[in-house]
Regions:
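C-terminal hydrophobic helical "lid"/dimerization subdomain
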Residues: 1, 237, 282-333
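Conserved beta-strand positions in the Rossmann-like core of class I SAM-dependent methyltransferases
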Residues: 68, 196, 250
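N-terminal glycine-rich cofactor-binding segment
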Residues: 5-23, 40-69, 84, 102-116
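Mid-domain Rossmann-like dinucleotide-binding core that forms the NAD(H)/NADP(H) cofactor-binding site
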Residues: 137-217
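A short acidic, Gly/Pro-enriched loop at the edge of an enzyme's catalytic core
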Residues: 219-226
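Glycine-rich beta-strand-centered segment in the early N-terminal region that forms part
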Residues: 20-36, 49-95, 134-136
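Cysteine-cluster motifs in flexible loop/terminal segments that predominantly coordinate metals
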Residues: 39, 76-77, 86-131
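Glycine-rich phosphate-binding loop and adjacent beta-alpha segment
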Residues: 233-291, 327-333
Length: 333
């Protein structure tokens, strides 16, 4: 079967036609992949800022398709279902998993990063991680389901923290209007919150405004809730400077570099900083796939065929909005 693999020298993507086709094992389903989204973590792998376990390496993790076959122990009636794939697979037995915090599982497998990814014609995944998608979801909404779930989880966690002191929730700021930032806007608007948005790229700000956000004013502060989605080194200082007294800052973006922090500002304003990583199984995916269509596909701005994966990855960072790859059309089209 065809698959897109990452090579090491040079660090480029290529399509191979003879990648082994998987067979669904016990408790697994075989998914015929229709599309895969590109996110910042994928771009870091492509650029060499992250390392896969081996080369050549199948990339991709934001995935939708349809179930082509079922393994032993899975209802045969699931064949033909349109699904989105939950790519983070926890062990289910460690203390974090038993406490319901599967996002903190130290043993979780991550499609595209610790195990081979999804940018292939077919993949085998545990049946519990292939979520049926409502009939009214277009392909664009389905390909955005995974990062939308990341946003949903961050908002859910923030609301749990702010439940004791809900004041200021109507004043919300999203820092970073990349694909994760814009999808966080979509999720907030669905909750009845119109966030202010901060980003250096005018095209990204225009997209955020189309989605129901607004451009943050220069120097504007007093935000009771701040979502930092960019991971930019300077973003933490921006967040602490714009947060209201007693405000909550949710860190979603990843940054591996040391950053200067003025703790006096955090202490005097009595700010709360919280990290939010991916989502918890099964609740967050169940919530997002079980809800009405939020129109997440509106963040999409570019689509490439599988044969142009290298071009798609090379261009994605400069696109205001999200880029995805069409692997194959729906069955029968």
């Amino acid at each position: 079967m065809r698959a897109v693999v990452l090579d090491t020298e040079p660090r480029t993507l290529r399509v191979v036609s003879d990648w082994p086709e998987p067979e669904p094992g016990p408790g697994e389903v075989l998914v015929r992949v229709r599309g895969v989204g590109i996110c910042g973590s994928d771009l870091a792998l492509h650029a060499g800022r992250r390392q896969p376990p081996s080369f050549p390496w199948v990339v991709g993790h934001e995935t939708f398709g349809e179930i082509a076959a079922t393994g032993p122990g899975v209802e045969r009636g699931r064949t033909g279902q349109h699904v989105v794939v939950e790519p983070n697979i926890p062990c289910g037995t460690c203390p974090a998993c038993r406490a319901g915090r599967t996002s903190a599982c130290p043993h979780r497998k991550v499609l595209g990063f610790s195990v081979p990814g999804t940018l292939a014609e077919k993949i085998a995944v545990p049946a519990a991680y292939a979520w049926p998608v409502p009939d009214d979801w277009a392909d664009g909404d389905a390909v955005c389901a995974e990062p939308l779930t990341v946003a949903h989880a961050a908002i859910r966690r923030a609301m749990a923290v702010k439940a004791a002191a809900p004041a200021g929730l109507e004043r919300c700021l999203v820092i970073g209007a990349g694909s994760q930032g814009t999808l966080t806007c979509v999720a907030l608007v669905a909750c009845g919150i119109a966030p202010a948005v901060l980003d250096p790229q005018p095209g990204r700000l225009a997209l955020a405004a189309e989605l129901g956000g607004r451009v943050a004013e220069p120097g504007e502060g007093g935000f009771g809730l701040v979502f930092e989605t960019s991971g930019a080194p300077e973003a933490l200082a921006e967040a602490t400077g714009r947060a209201a007294r007693g405000g909550l800052i949710v860190l979603m973006g990843l940054n591996a570099q040391p950053v200067p922090v003025v703790t006096q500002r955090i202490v005097q304003r009595q700010l709360t900083l919280m990290g939010s990583l991916i989502y918890d199984h099964p609740g967050d995916f169940a919530a997002v796939t079980g809800e009405r269509n939020r129109g997440a596909g509106r963040v999409l701005r570019a689509c490439y065929p599988m044969a142009e994966a290298e071009t798609a990855f090379s261009a994605a960072a400069a696109v205001p909005g999200k880029t995805w790859i069409r692997v194959q059309p729906p069955e029968g089209s």
